[in-house]
Amino acid sequence: MDSTGRAYDGASEFKSVLVTEGTSHYTPVEVYNILDELKTIKITSTIAEQSVVSRTPIPLSKIGLSDVKKLFDINVIKCGSSLRIVDEPQVTFIVSYAKDIYDKFMCIEHDSAYEPSLTMHRVRVIYSMLNDYCAKMISEVPYESSFVGELPVKSVTLNKLGDRNMDALAEHLLFEQDVVNAQRENRIFYQRKSAPAVPVTFGDDLEPAVRERANLYHRYSVPYHQIELALHALANDLLSIQYCHPTVVYNYLSSRAPNFLRLDDQVSLKLTSAGIGTLMPRPVVQLLDYDLVYMSPLALNNLASRLLRKISLHLVMQMVTAVQQDLGEVVSVSSNVTNPASACLVRMNVQGVQTLAVFIAQSMLNPNISYGMLSGLTLDCFSNFIYGACLMLFQALIPPSALTARQRLDINNRFAYFLIKCHATQATTASVVPNQVIYPVDAIDQWQSNRRDVLVAIYNNLLPGELVLSNLIQTYFRGNTAQQAAEILIPADQTSYGANETRALSAPYLFGAPINMLAPDARLSTYKRDLALPDRSPILITTVEGQNSISIEILRHKTGLIRAMYLNGFVTQPPAWIRNANSNTALLSRFLDVTPNLLGIYEAILANTYANAVNVYCDSVYRADIPTEWKLHQSVDPQDLLFGVFGIVPQYQILNEAVPDFFAGGEDILILQLIRAVYDTLSNKLGRNPADIFHLDEVFKVIEEIVSVLVQQKVDARKYFTESMRSGSFSKPRWDNFLRRPVAQRLPNLDSVIMTQADHVYNYMTQLTHIIPITDCFYIVKNSGFVDRGSTGPVMASSSVYENVLKVVHTIADFEAANALRLQRRSVDNTSYTDSLSDMFNGLRSISSSEFVRSVNGRSVFTEGRIDAIKVNMRVKFDLQFITEEGGYSKPPNVKKLMFSDFLSFLDSHKSDYRPPLLTVPITIGLNNLGETNSNTLRMRSEAIDEYFSSYVGAQILVPINVVDTRVYTEFSELRNFFTGDVVITDDPFDVWDGVKATYIPIGVHGVRLDPNGDQPPL
């Protein structure tokens, strides 16, 4: 139809258009009144849609240097003494682990002390850290012009860095000259300098004008430890694998356009004219394990839905009234006369033809997503010549996979029943019935419940003179012998439905090819192979010799069979419709004459599949092991072909919009591969199968969180492993089957690199465990505490003690051993009980609190020299608190302590736990900042001061002071050396284009020919 609404090539004036919306599975049906026969077929595909897959699983963001989270805290004190005045107190910088930084990875706040649980937790957290740290690229460092002597320099502006303002820290130094010198050295240390090299290696072959160069970057020395900058530095790697210059995108899109498409001119100009520093999401070459989609009902259902949305068929048809009028003249009856011929006149279903065409198209695109349920398939269905003829033609239009094996078997048996009833000689019937080859014609129940192929059995037991029956069956089986028809193509144990796929169940369909040897549409195979794309194509719907030619042989074979069935006479009593029914035979003759009209369906399908041939959801391989309940089912009525035969106008110009998805449709496949990859990662880290250690719910929770990060959407992994598309319950056998399957294809490079990156972060973080507040053991004592009021050292008091003053008298191996001691109870008297752990504790030697506080020189000294202790080998976390002691002593500090009774309560609360949580042990350290005061009060050995420091004494569960990882610097240069790291950033931030839509436009017209040698021979 042209833009004015008239048909082409002299056809009559356009009369009406019937548009049926229905559901998304249906497309508009165009209805015309066509008088002239058209000779030319031209099919074009109009494609204009975003057709490239580019993903940024870890999208990058920009932050300033001051936004970098700090791993270390700095405390500044001036150490004095409680026994004497110190004229020049030592300025000391204490560097300690900062709370809330990387704590999720280190399990500071929560998690089990059980080592595998800790490992799995850390693997999970790593991926959130990729977003929290590695995806945040430092893009701004404040700097200013200054001088070092007479030399002009660009120094980092320290006063914009908060508590990392090294100039402010230098002001704590005792002497003014030291302050000035330190600040001058800061300007020398923290400078902007030329970058030694390009930090971001994109690895693309770019033109020199748009290639990254070192002179576009600068290196900044900043007051951060390299550990604090390390994760942010990984952003460069994430940038290079997820982004590229627009010219790379242009080359990618141009090389991947099939020969009927080219990139839109405006898009091409925009991409090729992009300057240096411009980036786009990098196109992803996804060489995925496409067969995985057939292991998950959800993935298969999603793929089927996408496929159905891509079917766009425009069938050109005559007006229903015109067809009815024409046929009424043929059969010489009016529409109110009741017989099969007149009945068919009122049964012209336009929408039914469209439904059948869409069903045929989806069966060609992928034989594994759906199946048809034939309506009207009764035992005596072939006695209705309209139904029988339409069913035979329907077989010629569909691959065998379009129907279930059970339905195909039923068709064979219904055909066998018709042959025995109408065409078999009396001698044949007398031969095969007694030998139980078939059932008697009147044994209706046995025929209907039969589960064997009776047609093959008849074929194999025909009498030598039974030519009519032999020819009919041989024609039906496409010339195959009885032995060939009985050949098993797929054994029953390799099918989900437990039935043998024989050649007899494939031969009557399409080209007669076996169900496991359906020919793929190879028109675009060279294009796909050149790009290393998967060689997945729809089922070929044309002849193998002419890949864009539809052969009339498809239908000629079936029309010959229909003539033999209904018009060449009957050996036995004919069906009722034959008697005195000239109108019926006239209708059938006309029906067979115009059967080539059905090629119009193939024209529309071929136009659609040409574009779809590059899509990943296409497949020509039938997979018998896919459960039937996973597939979509659709009710189809073969009699709907009736209007298709009489009403479709073939050889008509079809303007068809068919948009290829290219890689789209592989999302679920990628998710399934990521699920497997994450599961394997957990297995490697744990050293065994995670399901052997944890409940599957725990494992899936970790898998889902990681995969959700990588695909940037919420993923419910369990939904991929159910019994069917309509079942929401998880199937353990499906999951086990998924794990047993060998990994056939590695992850796309993008995801593989990101997972490798995550592994690097994991290994890097585990190397930092020495600074985190977790230790492998703790001690139980009767009393503890430490006071050193007379020292000029940084630690003045503590709620714990040093490990060298502990005398281990008992060792408890682990939580289970401690729990067992607690459960070993015995009666003390008639009213009380004790347990072995309490007995062990009560046996420890007790030290008076006064020994921890009062001494001649202000330092704790014990009469016995050491403290009896029980060592418990359990992972615990410690909560470190600093109190700055400046000599006021006005109010005793609130020092947290853990008592033995608290430990007993912990055991009682978790006695049934296989994996207990971490016990938290508080440690409080009083820092010596007495150099800030000149008060004489602090040197008085009063009981009030002793009482003040007794607040530090009394803890019974402790982690030794020396376990706490702190760094003490008395020289400012040492502090500066510790906090010196390098950042290399671009002078001009990257310009990222996220909203560019890559569109294709068609090139030329691609024709589909009916029999390339010219005119069609009559049927």
Swiss-Prot record:
The keyword Chloroplast does not apply. Homodimer. Homomultimer. GO terms for cellular component: host cell cytoplasm; viral outer capsid. Belongs to the phytoreovirus inner capsid protein P3 family. It is found in: Virion; Host cytoplasm. Keywords: Capsid protein, Host cytoplasm, Outer capsid protein, Virion. Capsid protein which self-assembles to form the inner icosahedral capsid with a T=2 symmetry, and consisting of 60 P3 dimers. It comes from Rice dwarf virus (isolate Fujian). The keyword Chaperone does not apply. This is Outer capsid protein P3. One of its GO terms (molecular function) is structural molecule activity.
